[in-house]
């Protein structure tokens, strides 16, 4: 069969066997790759299709950068070599057919049929005249009759198709079509036409996504609720993991004091005062506080734990990415605080120095999770050099050998999870995220923890992502959460505060 341009959904490497983009539920098991729907019941197939639709709609709404993009298998990979061999075999077979006496147009007719369907799919609803023209010029029965009489003019049809493509394509494809016009070999020309048509289909899909995004955003909550309810009706146990997740959150919030001597700052603590008696362990927590505790727990989720709440499965990959960013910011802020404590405030009043130190630390801590000791050894040495050079450039007293050794030791000690500075920074960051959930981003920024001021920009960006994602989830699944929480916390308290976003 001809090679069609492979495309994938951004942030999702899954591709269906026929080359069409297929959504994949985050957290999907690798074993599912061998799962064959053809052998399953119609109800299961319908459920999978509904989940796919829901996943794509959700992705478009919450991911502003969502689009379909071209992907090419690595040429040296087994998959890449196999695919290339199969495609070459097809095109060589087509060439043999066209060069035979008399010419065999079997494969050519199939290709022209595919080209016709693709061209028609690129038309807008009101382009009826052009639609009729394509139907007539590429009429399958007529082309078949011409082929039977050996009169099928492939070069002429290819030129006609190129003219249509030039008319329908986005400006970004003009150059590719101009290159096709210089190809004289009919087989290579057909191959190029199909490749560029695949890109044009991708462009049309992205245009459609962009056009429909405002509509989807306006109706996404009702749509996702309706689709999820349909799935819940078919599978009543669909909220089992969600119930476990909220139960654990309720336990956590009643056993952990919401504020402690190590809490960020008094101003931030006051801004994030906990409603509905959540600050008193003798009182049951409100549904909203339990839900927000559950959201924060997602950033600590064990990757080996498969019991991920069903209502957040579509955001699992995003939450994992946010958890990774949170971890990176914790290490970054810890490094900056230690470095500032040794070098003094004067050096850290230089934006150029702070930015340079942040860039260096970010680059070196990319592999902190997999190689913490080696990473922090490199970080400590580089930061020590930066501090020494920075103090020297500003005409300040450089660190003594003793202080340098102490700086290196404290930086390397950040590797340990129980490190005092790292633990406090982690508390500050999570407390800030709780502030964002409770009171919104603007108020939280007004009471930003002083100890995190060096990463204010990065943490605000993380907070926005987390807040927007959880806000959308709360709007969609709030009614389900409220119903579950009625059975987890005291009924009177459950009715006191609805699970609605602030």
Swiss-Prot record:
Top-level taxonomy: Eukaryota, Metazoa, Chordata, Craniata, Vertebrata
Cystine pairings recorded for this chain:
none
Q: Where is the signal peptide?
A: none
Pfam families in UniProt: Tcp11
The name on file for this protein is T-complex protein 11-like X-linked protein 2
Which family does this protein fall into? Belongs to the TCP11 family.
Q: Quote a single Gene Ontology cellular component term.
A: sperm flagellum
Per the record, which residues fall in region Disordered? 1-36
One GO term (biological process): regulation of sperm capacitation
């Amino acid at each position: 069969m001809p090679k069609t341009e492979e495309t994938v959904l951004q942030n999702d490497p899954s591709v269906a066997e026929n080359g069409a983009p297929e959504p994949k539920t985050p957290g999907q098991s690798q074993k599912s790759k061998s799962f064959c729907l053809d052998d399953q019941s119609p109800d299961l197939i319908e459920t999978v299709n509904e989940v796919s639709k829901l996943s794509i709609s959700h992705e478009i709404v919450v991911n502003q950068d969502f689009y379909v993009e071209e992907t090419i298998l690595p040429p040296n990979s087994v998959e890449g070599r196999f695919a290339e061999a199969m495609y070459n075999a097809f095109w060589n077979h087509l060439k043999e057919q066209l060069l035979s006496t008399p010419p065999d147009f079997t494969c050519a007719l199939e290709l022209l049929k595919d080209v016709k369907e693709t061209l028609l799919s690129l038309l807008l609803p009101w382009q009826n005249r052009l639609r009729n023209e394509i139907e007539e010029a590429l009429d399958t029965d007529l082309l078949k009759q011409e082929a039977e009489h050996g009169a099928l003019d492939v070069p002429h049809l290819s030129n006609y198709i190129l003219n249509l493509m030039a008319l329908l394509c986005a400006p970004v494809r003009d150059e590719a079509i101009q290159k096709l016009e210089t190809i004289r070999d009919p087989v290579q020309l057909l191959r190029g036409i199909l490749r560029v048509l695949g890109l044009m289909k991708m462009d049309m899909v992205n245009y459609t996504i962009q056009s429909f995004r405002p509509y989807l955003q306006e109706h996404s909550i009702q749509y996702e609720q309706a689709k999820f309810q349909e799935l819940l009706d078919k599978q009543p146990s669909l909220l089992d993991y969600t119930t476990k997740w909220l139960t654990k959150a309720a336990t956590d919030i009643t056993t952990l004091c919401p504020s402690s001597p190590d809490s960020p700052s008094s101003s931030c603590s006051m801004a994030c005062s906990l409603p509905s008696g959540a600050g008193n362990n003798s009182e049951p927590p409100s549904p909203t506080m339990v839900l927000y505790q559950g959201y924060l727990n997602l950033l600590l989720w064990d990757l080996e734990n498969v019991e991920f709440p069903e209502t957040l499965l579509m955001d699992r990959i995003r939450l994992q990415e946010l958890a990774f960013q949170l971890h990176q910011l914790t290490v970054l802020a810890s490094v900056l605080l230690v470095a500032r404590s040794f070098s003094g405030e004067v050096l850290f009043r230089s934006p150029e120095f702070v930015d340079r130190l942040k860039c260096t630390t970010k680059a070196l801590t990319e592999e902190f999770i997999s190689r913490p000791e080696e990473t922090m050894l490199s970080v400590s040495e580089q930061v020590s050099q930066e501090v020494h050079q920075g103090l020297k450039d500003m005409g300040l007293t450089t660190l003594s050998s003793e202080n340098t050794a102490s700086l290196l030791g404290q930086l390397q000690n950040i590797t340990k999870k129980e490190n005092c500075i790292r633990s406090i920074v982690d508390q500050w960051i999570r407390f800030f995220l709780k502030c964002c959930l409770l009171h919104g981003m603007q108020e939280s920024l007004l009471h930003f923890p002083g100890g995190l001021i060096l990463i204010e920009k990065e943490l605000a960006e993380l907070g926005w992502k987390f807040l927007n994602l959880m806000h959308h989830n709360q709007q969609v699944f709030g009614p389900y959460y409220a119903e579950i929480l009625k059975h987890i916390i005291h009924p009177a308290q459950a009715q006191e505060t609805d699970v609605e976003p602030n």
